Design a protein with these regions (language model features):
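Short alpha-helix boundary/capping and kink motifs at helix termini
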Residues: 2-62, 69-72
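A subset of signal/propeptide-processing and intrinsically disordered low-complexity segments
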Residues: 5, 96-98, 109, 113
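Exposed, low-complexity/repetitive linear segments and helix-based recognition motifs
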Residues: 7, 98-100, 124
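Compositionally biased, low-complexity repeat tracts
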Residues: 17-19, 39, 85, 103, ...
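Exposed alpha-helical structural elements
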Residues: 31-35, 94, 120-121
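Compositionally biased, charge-rich terminal segments
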Residues: 32-35, 85, 108, 112
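A short, basic-hydrophobic beta/loop patch
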Residues: 44-107
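Alpha-helical interaction elements
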Residues: 102-128
């Protein structure tokens, strides 16, 4: 079983896959702005998924980019997160990218990209 730890992360300590040179920077298009607007309105979200970057105090964001953007827009300083071990976190980030591509291909009607976050939440419930 993968050890998942509930933490609060400073928003300034988050790094994306693209910022590390491991992914593509995606533009903030109309669709993404719509998701962020909805999240800002809702105000309560599932925790993001992060992986610690060794000896740096920073975290790799593996799931939850839209939630982070909404939190920044709301001027929040921190966000609730689930910390995954590095190997699992990188695998989750890769899987999440594939699932987002599937969602995009089918007009975001399959909600495949939600699978990663739901899995992590279920894992924390099983540990309690």
């Amino acid at each position: 079983m993968i050890k998942i730890k509930k933490i609060k992360v400073d928003l300034t300590k988050l790094v994306t896959m693209a910022e590390m040179g491991l992914g593509v920077v995606r533009p903030l298009n109309k669709e993404k702005r719509g998701w962020i607007k909805k999240l800002k309105k809702d105000g309560v979200w599932d925790p993001i998924l992060v992986t610690p970057i060794r000896d740096s105090g920073y975290y790799l964001l593996t799931d939850g980019w839209h939630r982070v953007q909404a939190a920044k827009a709301l001027k929040r300083k921190t966000i609730n997160a689930l910390q995954l071990p590095a190997d699992a976190g990188l695998s989750m980030a890769k899987a999440n990218k594939i699932l987002r591509d599937i969602d995009r291909q089918y007009g975001f009607k399959l909600y495949c990209s939600d699978i990663i976050g739901h899995w992590a939440m279920m894992q924390t419930l099983l540990e309690e």
